[in-house]
Regions:
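ATP-binding pocket architecture of kinase catalytic cores
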Residues: 46-225, 234-241
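Juxta-kinase regulatory segment immediately upstream of eukaryotic protein kinase catalytic domains
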Residues: 2-45
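Short, compositionally biased low-complexity segments
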Residues: 1-8, 180, 197-198
Length: 244
C-alpha cells in the first residue's frame, strides 16, 4: 500500500550485541551469590542468543554445582531485556512483572509454565535486567521468523497437529481467566494507571506503543486511520465499566 512503511527482505528480526563468550562466567559469578552454601556453579550456553524470543533475549543455559554433597545439573532459560543499541520491541521492560506473573500462574493454576528461579533487576550483571527459569522440553512456534510467515513446523504441520496447539492455547487462556480475584492478585500490573477503565488503558497503551515504534519504522496511515476511527466510534456502554 502506498505510503506504508516498507519492510524489505528480512531473514532475522532480532539482533543481539550480547557477548556469548563472557556470558557463562558472568552468570556463574552471579549464581554463586544466590545459590545456597557458597556453591560455585559451572555454566555453559546451549543456544538461544539471537535465535528466538523477539521481545527479549532468550538464552538456554546448563548450570552444574555441588550442594549438600550432591552434584546438581539444571537446564535453565535466561530471559534478558535487550540493550538499547539492539532492537527493543517495547519502550520499557518490566521483567519483574513477567517473573511475578509466571510465578503466580504456576502457583494458582495447572497452566504449564516453567518454574521461575531467580531475578536480577538492577542491570548491573548483564547490562540489563534478567531472570532465570527452568527449561521445559517441548516445541514452540518460532517468532524468528514468525510462524505465520510459513516454512516452519507449525505452518507445515497437519491440520490435527495445528488444532492440538490451538485447543491447548484456548484451554490455557480459559484457565488464566478463571483465576479468582485476579484484579487484586495481579494489581501490580496496573499500578499508577487506575484513572481510566480497562478498555481505555489498553487503547492508550497500544497507541503509546505505536508512537514508540514509528521512530524506527515510520508511520502507518492505515493504523493512524484505525486509531482515529476507534476514537470516533468509542463503545461508550462497554468503555464506561470494567469487564465482568
Amino acid at each position: 500500500m502506498a505510503n506504508e512503511p516498507a519492510i524489505g527482505a528480512i531473514d532475522r528480526l532480532q539482533r543481539s550485541s550480547r557477548d556469548v563468550t563472557t556470558l557463562p562466567a558472568v552468570i556463574s559469578r552471579w549464581l554463586s551469590s544466590v545459590l545456597p552454601g557458597g556453591a560455585a556453579p559451572e555454566v555453559t550456553v546451549e543456544s538461544g542468543v539471537d535465535s528466538t524470543g523477539m521481545s527479549s533475549e532468550t538464552i538456554i543455559l546448563t548450570a552444574r554445582w555441588q550442594q549438600d554433597g550432591r552434584s546438581i545439573q539444571q537446564k535453565l532459560v535466561a530471559r534478558v531485556a535487550p540493550a538499547a543499541e539492539d532492537v527493543p520491541v517495547f519502550p520499557t521492560y518490566r521483567l519483574d512483572h513477567q517473573f511475578e506473573v509466571i510465578r503466580l500462574v504456576g502457583e494458582l493454576t495447572d497452566v504449564p509454565v516453567p518454574r521461575v528461579r531467580w531475578i536480577e533487576t538492577t542491570g548491573d550483571v548483564l547490562g540489563t535486567p534478567f531472570f532465570l527459569m527452568d527449561y521445559v522440553e517441548g516445541v514452540v512456534p518460532p517468532d524468528v521468523m514468525p510462524y505465520t510467515f510459513g516454512d516452519n513446523w507449525f505452518a507445515d504441520a497437519p491440520a490435527e497437529r495445528q488444532r492440538q496447539l490451538q485447543d491447548a492455547t484456548v484451554a490455557a487462556l480459559a484457565t488464566l481467566h478463571s483465576i479468582p480475584n485476579a484484579q487484586n492478585t495481579f494489581s501490580f500490573l496496573t499500578q499508577g494507571r487506575t484513572s481510566d477503565t480497562t478498555l481505555h488503558r489498553h487503547f492508550n497503551w497500544v497507541r503509546s506503543w505505536y508512537d514508540f515504534a514509528v521512530e524506527g519504522i515510520g508511520r502507518s496511515p492505515l493504523l493512524e486511520r484505525s486509531f482515529e476511527w476507534l476514537q470516533s466510534h468509542w463503545p461508550d456502554d462497554a468503555a464506561a465499566r470494567e469487564p465482568d
